């Protein structure tokens, strides 16, 4: 009986060690919070939705739109979406460390991004656009206000949808592993 318990304990310990090697490990990368308010969540990473797993965090904005949304680190704006569905108004920023931060359901963009979007909308004669600015077209520094929180796209109320992805694969990473509180 004692040997069975010992074998079970060793087996569980070995299993735990093996499985934990597949986990996403926490890192402190120096990223700042995308909002200047406490990060209270209405949706968490990996939650099962009606037809997919949630790939980011839904951060409550205290029932308000128009809160400053900051770049979490320096980088280049690599993609901008304007749509009545999905992420609505969204900004993607590629960072030098190989990660991309995504900010969605925004009410409006910073003046520089807004001017870029408006020019493209007129040129394409379309309100809905998916834009990929060239390298160096839209650079941001850590803490720059890139947009304001909102309720655009397929959103059930004012909040910020925030993601961190691997840039080369677009594989979603759990933002909580970067120490956001």
Give residue spans per PLM region.
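Bacterial N-terminal signal peptides
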Residues: 10-18
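Surface-exposed, glycine-biased beta-strand/turn segments
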Residues: 23-90, 94-99, 107-112, 127-129, ...
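Bacterial N-terminal signal peptides that target proteins for export
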Residues: 1-11
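A solvent-exposed, charged loop/short amphipathic helix patch at secondary-structure junctions
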Residues: 117-128
């Amino acid at each position: 009986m004692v040997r069975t318990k010992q074998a079970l304990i060793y087996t569980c310990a070995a299993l735990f060690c093996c499985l934990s090697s597949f986990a996403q490990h926490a890192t402190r990368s120096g990223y700042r919070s995308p909002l200047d308010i406490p990060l209270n969540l209405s949706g968490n990473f990996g939650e099962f939705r009606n037809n997919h797993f949630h790939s980011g965090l839904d951060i409550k904005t205290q029932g308000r739109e128009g809160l400053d949304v900051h770049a979490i680190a320096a980088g280049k704006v690599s993609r901008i979406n304007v749509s009545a569905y999905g992420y609505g108004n969204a900004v993607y920023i590629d960072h030098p460390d190989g990660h991309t931060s995504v900010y969605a359901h925004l009410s409006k963009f910073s003046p520089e991004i807004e001017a870029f979007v408006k020019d493209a909308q007129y040129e394409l004669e379309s309100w809905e656009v998916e834009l990929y600015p060239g390298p160096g077209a839209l650079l941001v520094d850590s803490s720059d206000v890139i947009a304001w929180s909102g309720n655009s796209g397929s959103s059930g109320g004012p909040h910020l949808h925030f993601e961190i992805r691997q840039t080369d694969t677009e594989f979603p990473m759990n933002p909580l592993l970067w120490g956001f509180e």
